[in-house]
Swiss-Prot record:
Biological source species: Blochmanniella pennsylvanica (strain BPEN)
Keywords of this entry: Ribonucleoprotein, Ribosomal protein, RNA-binding, rRNA-binding
Name the record gives this protein: Large ribosomal subunit protein bL21
Keyword DNA-binding among record annotations: no
Stretch forming the signal peptide: none
Subunit organization: Part of the 50S ribosomal subunit. Contacts protein L20.
Length: 105
């Protein structure tokens, strides 16, 4: 059984027990979070497709960690002008573990 859900501006395909990195959710480590924007659930019996979301479906996940991604280096450069600008960025993300995928018919 797998599901596709949307959080932030991205979509993720998950199965129960999977650990994934998503955009930052402002909750503490150890809390559970529920996702209601489910686009698709594929169980062994049948396939449920939302339009755009499945109304009676939900995904429950546990927050494992809040951390920062690797640093991205940004360099701006203009030739022959002796202009160089260096900047870095570290994106925040949340690591979650999918506890259960539920759907009521």
């Amino acid at each position: 059984m797998y599901a596709v859900f949307q959080t932030g501006s991205k979509q993720y395909r998950v199965v129960e027990g999977q650990v994934i990195h998503i955009e930052r959710i402002d909750l503490e480590v150890g809390n559970q979070v529920e996702f209601n924007q489910i686009l698709l659930i594929d169980s062994n019996e049948c396939l449920h497709i939302g339009s755009p979301f499945i109304k009676k479906g939900r995904i429950i996940a546990e927050i494992i960690a809040q951390s920062l991604n690797q640093k991205i280096k940004i360099i701006k450069f203009r030739r022959r002008k002796h202009f160089r600008k260096f900047q870095g960025h570290r994106q925040c993300f949340t690591t979650i573990k999918i506890v259960s995928i539920k759907h009521k018919h």
